[in-house]
Amino acid sequence: LADRCKFELMDYRDVTGAFDRIVSIGMFEHVGVPHYEAYFRNVRNLLKQDGIALIHTIGRSDPPDTTSPWILKYIFPGGYVPAMSEAIAPIERQYLFATDIEVWRLHYAQTLRCWHDRFMANIDKARALYDDRFCRMWRYYLIACELTFRYNHQVVFQFQLAKEQDAVPLTRDYLYRDDAHKNVRKGLHHAAE
């Protein structure tokens, strides 16, 4: 990918420029509710007029709530799993179109199960790098989170956002075509077929 994009480790508030695509994966959980407005303002300001943003975040399908004290202490200090309602309002206030919202229900439970299986398959390598306490804690984290996604209303949200409501075709069909890698705006007239 190095010839197609540039990777920089920096605060999202320090990014400058204009982009045709913005992708945020696993970061929104660390922004904090008081900063959602500024976050989506940044997304809007950084998008070109016909640009598209994809915000991929762990979320809750319940109303807003608190984060597990154990997760806050040992895994994601300062992290918070947002309810969809907490993200939608600041998106609307920034006049961004939610051109698509996808909710992955059990997908991440399966991902966590695979991570646990791989961790256990490599437990001796992990123990060579980390103490037993850490290995037990990591295993507990993977199992507990899998169960949370499977039974306690944890999901993954994918918000597709744009400044213009016609930035993408009307349906998701363009995502599944063989030529999906091409500029999606070229296929707008095919959206209703």
Which stretches of residues belong to each language-model region?
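Hydrophobic/aromatic anchor residues within beta-strands of the central parallel beta-sheet
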Residues: 2-7, 53
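A short glycine-rich, Lys/Arg-flanked "PGG" loop and its adjoining helix->strand segment in the class I
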Residues: 37-52
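General small-molecule cofactor/ligand-binding pocket signal
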Residues: 6-10, 99-102
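Active-site-proximal loop/turn and secondary-structure-junction residues that shape catalytic pockets
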Residues: 11-13, 27-28, 59
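A short acidic, Gly/Pro-enriched loop at the edge of an enzyme's catalytic core
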Residues: 8-23
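Short, cationic low-complexity segments
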Residues: 174-193
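Short SAM/SAH-binding signature in class I
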Residues: 19-29, 38
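Substrate-binding/catalytic lobe of Class I Rossmann-like enzymes that use SAM or dcSAM, i.e.
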Residues: 58-169, 183
